[in-house]
């Protein structure tokens, strides 16, 4: 499947690792999660090696919509029901902090980051939206 990212971005290539390597931390996977781990480790001066079996950002990251959100469908009602208020609050807070971190990172690079509103709707089950709002109000 073609991706907008592979059509519009020239990704760097790196030589294959040769011989034995010693590192404090090994990051397996060069998608967004792996690259972000490497970024934060580098900022802390921690020795790491990132390995990717194919091309950087060629897996899930390549096919992402690049939408960064804390709204992942109608999940908060389910989280409150199954995990409780405290853990649901921790999940929401972690997602909100991630959004803020992405925004701060994107101010340092040219990537056309924009904050936009998001919406959830239901044509058939409006009560699900009401449950979600109730969970978020808690």
Task: Go through each PLM region and give its residues.
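Glycine-rich FAD pyrophosphate-binding loop
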Residues: 43-63
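Extreme N-terminal leader/targeting segments of oxidoreductases
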Residues: 1-25, 43
């Amino acid at each position: 499947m073609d991706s907008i990212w592979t059509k519009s971005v020239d990704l760097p290539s790196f030589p294959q690792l040769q011989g034995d390597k010693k590192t404090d931390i090994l990051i397996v996977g060069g998608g967004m999660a792996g690259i972000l781990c490497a970024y934060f480790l580098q900022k802390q001066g921690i020795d790491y090696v990132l390995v990717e079996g194919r091309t950087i950002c060629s897996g899930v990251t390549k096919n992402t919509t690049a939408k960064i959100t804390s709204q992942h469908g109608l999940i908060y009602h389910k989280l409150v029901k199954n995990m409780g208020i405290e853990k649901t609050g921790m999940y929401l807070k972690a997602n909100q902090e991630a959004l803020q971190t992405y925004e701060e990172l994107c101010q340092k690079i040219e990537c056309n980051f924009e904050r936009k509103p998001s919406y959830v709707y239901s044509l058939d089950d409006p009560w699900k939206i009401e449950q979600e709002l109730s969970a978020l109000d808690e």
